[in-house]
Amino acid sequence: MTDINYYVDLLKRNLPKYKKLKVNTLSESEAKEVVAKLLADGFGVELQSGNTFVLKSSSIPPVGVSDNTNKTTAKDNVSDKSSENEVAQPKQVTPPVDATGNTNKTAVTSMRVSIRLPAQVADALLSVYNEPNLSNAIRKAIKDALSAKGISVQFPAPVTTTTAKKSIPSIDEVFRND
């Protein structure tokens, strides 16, 4: 004997979708038992030609589909309400709390911020910083003044150029007789 409950569940899921199903593996007596269980569960089912099941009334909601759609619409309604609340109230950020109840404060170790300076200001800073006659104390003072304003600057290494004296060789140097 086949499992009648298996066919009952199968027909509950598929009859609302297809309206008519033929199950060749059921005998007529087993099909009558399946119809009896479906009628007891509230499905309007009719048995035609031995093993063909036809849904009589389409007013019965599909078992799997209706639950999912109802849940989906309920979730949509809840999410719509929550999104309205989020728009109305700004989010409040609270610092994390450890097990002892103290609030954890995390420090930012380093942060890179780029700011736009006018080209004249940047050029002036670089030219003053790279001035060959400028002492290291003044360079350090420039960095400290900028850092006091909250600006961390890393200047390139100062350019020290030594220009060789371009002199015209003397006649004696050119026409040396060694």
UniProtKB/Swiss-Prot annotation:
Positions of region (Disordered): 64-103
Annotated Basic and acidic residues bias: 73-84
Official protein name in the record: Uncharacterized protein ORF178
Species this protein is from: Acidianus filamentous virus 2 (isolate Italy/Pozzuoli) (AFV-2)
